[in-house]
Amino acid sequence: SVPVIAVGRINDPELAEKILQEGKADLVSMGRALIADPQLPLKTIEGRLEEIRKCVACDYGCISRLFAGLRITCNINPDVGKEKEYKITRGEKVKNVIVAGGGLAGMESARVAALRGHNVTLYEKTGELGGQFVLATKPPHKEELQNVLDYLRVQMDKLGIRIELGREVSAKLVEEHKPDAVIVATGAVPLVPNIPSIEDKRVVTAWDVLAGAASVK
């Protein structure tokens, strides 16, 4: 018989195993999944499935750039293509670091700082981590983006990063704690044009709709 290799959107080792166990293929090939997390096979062997950074098939950094003749990147793995430059090493001195903002940039910054051996406290002014990326998971068929948030939240816990929800970083807070470094990752706000009737109650932003604060019928 001819060996069959299954390929395409297989980003979960449990799905890969299911394909093999059910006899649907002899081998499973992963491409983008290993760009997003090169350690996926090792984490699977060690039973650390919750630590896998799963590809979300955005294709923005890999396939789209490859077809354009550009160096590939990855939206959820900033190391791709710059592994040498971004090599994470232990700092010479342990520092106290404050991260302002609990979105993707804030959590990734906190993760790297902790891996370098620093004491990290992350402040998020809302009641949950994720920032505006939480809204990105709300539209239909975008639920898989939740994998990115799940991965980073697991990392926050695994690395012992102190999380302060419902607290905003201020000059007073920084003065009180006197950290060695402050990382500002407070995100962006919608650019609302200054045009007539913009304050009308019928005018809403995408942020409001996705957050459930406004409805469009």
Outline where the language-model segments fall.
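FAD-binding core/adjacent interface of flavoenzyme oxidoreductases
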Residues: C58-C62, L66, R90, R162-K217
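N-terminal Rossmann-like dinucleotide/flavin-binding domain of flavoprotein oxidoreductases
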Residues: G131-H177
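Flavin-dependent oxidoreductase catalytic cores
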Residues: S1-A100, L104-V120, E128, P190-L191, ...
